[in-house]
Amino acid sequence: MHPQGSNRQKRNLGLWSAAGVVVCGMVGAGIFTTTGLHAAELGSGWAVMLVWAVGGLLALCGTLTYIELAALWPEAGGSYVFVRNIYGPMSGFVVGLSVAIVGFMGSIAVVGLTLGAYFQKVVPSVSPDTMATVAVLVATLVHCFGVRESNAVNQLGALFKIILLTGLVCWGFSVDATAATPPPSVGGDPTGLSSSVFGSAMAAVAFAYLGWDNPTYIAGEIRNTKRSLKWGMTLGMLAVTALYLLVNWVFLRAAAPHEMIHPDGSPVVDIGRFATVRLFGETVGGTFNILILLVLFSTLSLTAMVGARVFYSMGRKGELPGALTILNRRGSPVIALAVQCAGVLLLIRFTGLKDLLESVGVILTVISGATVLGVILLRIRRPGLPRPFRVPLYPVPPVIYLLLTVWMAWSVFRSNPTSIILTLGTIGVTLAVWFGFSRRHSRPPSSGDTAA
């Protein structure tokens, strides 16, 4: 183990690594579940495509805004570092611990449980909880071998996801789909949708787009930070958005929105398998189910890598025990990885998939909105601050992001009051830890860190 004083992360990652982190982190459970859950409620192919397009716009606005902050503070930690430097140590701690516990541990548990559910269709005797536990343990061990090794896994995962989705799109458009016509000729008009229905679907789509900010959490390990983050995040996000729209078009060729329900009236959660079975037959559908398992494990692996860096960053600030900053000889934050793994296993054991999805989506939406607002506050308070990168068309991207964030959060809170309790509960726990321990140990930001 390295002594704590030498625990500086090396910048081993480049532009394509940053893009790979975006692709690998974004493409996961969401694209293979969300459309099936909400298509029938949306009622038309146009509405399905519109909600995914607006989700892409939201992610683009968030990406451009986060790049400005990441260029100011090119260190590991993402939203935690940004909020800490803008709003102060307490706010940064609340955000950091919320992201670490709910955003990353929760997301890892969600992907793990989804992976377990898909795996049970291959091996019915293995429960989703058991398979999720095995997947989390394997991913954690991989990342303990070092940054280069885990980065190789992530880049291979990103390449595999692009090949899989591109293959699905090309093959999907090559067959004669008689179940439904392409979205432009599907009946229905999105202007007839209620705001609450569209907002609820948007919240689910936003979860599918989560991951566009992943490179900001490992910025301390990225070379030529300004160029790599700017192009890596933007290209990765645009590539995923294009793939998402094309994949959903394929889903709509397989079935009209009103057909994406089971005979008992429940939505088709496994929309990937459902669509491929209708387009290509049972054999291909079963094979696609196995490929989805690989996609889900790749996403789980990437999220585990990024999430541990939040604990690492908070440990360096003195807000969590210094043991979390310990790196092994290969440069991996092994203690942070172990703590994260233990937390994920507890979530898998004691929570359900639905509750996790709702809480993760709401809390991360609120956090990202607060972070984006910080860009506007910095422009007002420190207009002369040297900025290596400036948001194009400012203030349009951050304003669009904030408006959509408030609307989505309001829609979720209205439809599911439990999300309010979970959100307030998370904030309460983080504040208790702050006043009970972290406030006394937190080190103030250096003069070069604080910008607000």
Where are these regions (language model features)?
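TM-loop-TM module centered on a large, flexible mid-protein loop between adjacent transmembrane helices
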Residues: 81-82, 88, 121, 232-301, ...
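Helix-loop-helix junctions that connect adjacent transmembrane segments
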Residues: 2-10, 49, 124-127, 156-289
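Hydrophobic transmembrane alpha-helices that form the core helical bundles
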Residues: 37-40, 60-136, 140-144, 288, ...
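A generic transmembrane alpha-helix motif of multi-pass inner-membrane proteins
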Residues: 358-363, 393-452
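C-terminal membrane-solvent junction of multi-pass transporters and transport-like membrane proteins
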Residues: 323-334, 368-419
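Membrane-interface loop-to-helix entry segments
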Residues: 116, 128-181, 233-237, 360-370, ...
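Helix-loop-helix connectors at the membrane interface of multi-pass transporters/channels
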Residues: 1-5, 80-84, 112-131, 164, ...
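Membrane-interface "cap" regions at the ends of multi-pass membrane proteins
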Residues: 1-36, 40-46, 59-60, 64, ...
